[in-house]
């Protein structure tokens, strides 16, 4: 989603929210949470507060009028009723017979509410230096995690990774084979953004950075001589990330055409640009997601930018067998998150079984 549209939708939601949600928003913006994360949280609060109005828990007529006391006095049974509502309500999509949202969506909703309750009961300060209230009902609400072993998850993910030679083959396919299938009109559009698209995909595959970290890169963050980039990690921390050498020619080629192709001036600091009616802008995450999906589906299987991050992590672990190194590359504080990659790279286990 374009940044301007995202901010417009955020403002629309904020206009309907109670004062304490607006305070929460400002507090998390200072952390900083990304606008995308805050937008998703606001959507969850909108869903929750609409249920509060419908359920008769409050006499308020509008979301903005729901008093803080409603959240303070919310019971465990109330929250369980909300979860049942999510699980059983008919979906708006007329093409499905399924009732209720998925467990993943429910967990996301509860995560957003947990964040809000933690803020209200622990983080915020009133005039006396105390939180608004102390009772956190979300601590009593259990979440159900998707039942899937790490090995099963790894096997599912493995089918959507470009491992071994496939990393370079994917880039070569976009460069040489993909344009052969296009009409003259589509080819013109492809050629305009070819160097940029290849540079973005090469960077994701060569560094493992998150999509948000890639699109927020500025020119000053790129050091092609050292093959290092500076990114802003989750929580606002700056980090230096090494980039594999195979991405260098793609990044250099994009840089050579960036200013002229996208009409960039010195004031246009964003590294990856898009151009509309002669005006350069920072490329948005939604455009990259669509671009990666388009190329990957034509090559092998439709994937997300996050799967390219998984690809780099898996290849790096396969080469080093070091979870610490992989964790550092991905910007994780612990190696627990990287356990997944030890299961994806399980050739030793399979070889042992084949010898039985």
From Swiss-Prot:
What Pfam family is a match, any one?
Answer: Phage_int_SAM_1
What protein family does this chain belong to?
Answer: Belongs to the 'phage' integrase family. XerS subfamily.
Q: Which PANTHER family match?
A: PHAGE INTEGRASE-RELATED, TYROSINE RECOMBINASE XERC
Segments spanning the bilayer are none
The regulatory note on its activity is: FtsK is required for recombination.
GO molecular-function terms, A-Z: DNA binding; tyrosine-based site-specific recombinase activity
* Keyword Oxidoreductase in record: no
Q: PROSITE patterns from the entry?
A: CB (PS51900), TYR_RECOMBINASE (PS51898)
Top-level taxonomic group: Bacteria
For biological process, the GO terms are:
cell division; chromosome segregation; DNA recombination
Q: What does this protein do?
A: Site-specific tyrosine recombinase, which acts by catalyzing the cutting and rejoining of the recombining DNA molecules. Essential to convert dimers of the bacterial chromosome into monomers to permit their segregation at cell division.
According to its UniProt record, which residues of this chain constitute the active site? 210, 234, 306, 309, 332, 341 (o-(3'-phospho-dna)-tyrosine intermediate)
One GO location term (cellular component): cytoplasm
The UniProt record lists the Core-binding (CB) domain at 16-121
- Entry's NCBIfam families? PRK05084.1
Q: Does the keyword Cytoplasm apply?
A: yes
Quote the subcellular location field of this record.
Cytoplasm
**Protein name, as recorded:** Tyrosine recombinase XerS
Q: Where is the Tyr recombinase domain?
A: 169-354
Q: Write the record's keywords in alphabetical order, separated by commas.
A: Cell cycle, Cell division, Chromosome partition, Cytoplasm, DNA integration, DNA recombination, DNA-binding
């Amino acid at each position: 989603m374009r940044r301007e549209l995202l901010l417009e939708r955020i403002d629309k939601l904020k206009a309907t929210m109670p004062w304490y949600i607006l305070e929460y928003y400002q507090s998390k913006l200072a952390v900083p949470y990304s606008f995308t994360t805050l937008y998703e949280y606001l959507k969850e609060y909108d869903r929750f507060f609409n249920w509060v109005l419908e359920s008769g828990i409050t006499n308020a007529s509008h979301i903005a009028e729901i008093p803080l006391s409603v959240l303070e006095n919310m019971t465990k049974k109330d929250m369980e009723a909300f979860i049942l509502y999510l699980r059983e309500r008919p979906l708006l999509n007329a093409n499905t017979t399924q009732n209720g949202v998925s467990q993943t969506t429910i967990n996301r909703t509860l995560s957003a509410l947990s964040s809000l309750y933690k803020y209200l009961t622990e983080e915020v300060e009133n005039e006396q230096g105390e939180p608004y209230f102390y009772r956190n009902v979300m601590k009593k609400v259990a979440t159900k995690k998707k039942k899937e072993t790490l090995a099963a998850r790894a096997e599912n993910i493995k089918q959507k990774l470009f491992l071994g030679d496939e990393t370079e083959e994917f880039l070569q396919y976009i460069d040489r084979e993909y344009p052969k299938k296009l009409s003259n009109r589509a080819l013109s559009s492809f050629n305009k953004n070819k160097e940029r698209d290849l540079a973005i995909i090469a960077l994701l595959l060569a560094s493992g950075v998150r999509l948000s970290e890639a699109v927020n890169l500025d020119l000053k963050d790129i050091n092609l001589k050292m093959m290092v980039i500076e990114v802003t990690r989750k929580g606002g921390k700056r980090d230096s990330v090494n980039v594999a050498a195979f991405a260098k020619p793609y990044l250099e080629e994009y840089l050579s055409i960036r200013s002229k192709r996208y009409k960039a001036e010195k004031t246009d600091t964003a590294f990856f640009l898009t151009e509309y009616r002669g005006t350069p802008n920072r490329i948005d995450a939604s455009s990259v997601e669509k671009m990666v999906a388009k190329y990957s589906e034509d090559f092998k299987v439709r994937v997300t930018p996050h799967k390219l991050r998984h690809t780099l992590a898996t290849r790096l672990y396969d080469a080093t067998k070091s979870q610490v190194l992989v964790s550092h590359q991905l910007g994780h504080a612990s190696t627990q998150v990287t356990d997944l990659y030890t299961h994806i790279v399980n050739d030793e286990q399979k070889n042992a079984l084949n010898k039985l």
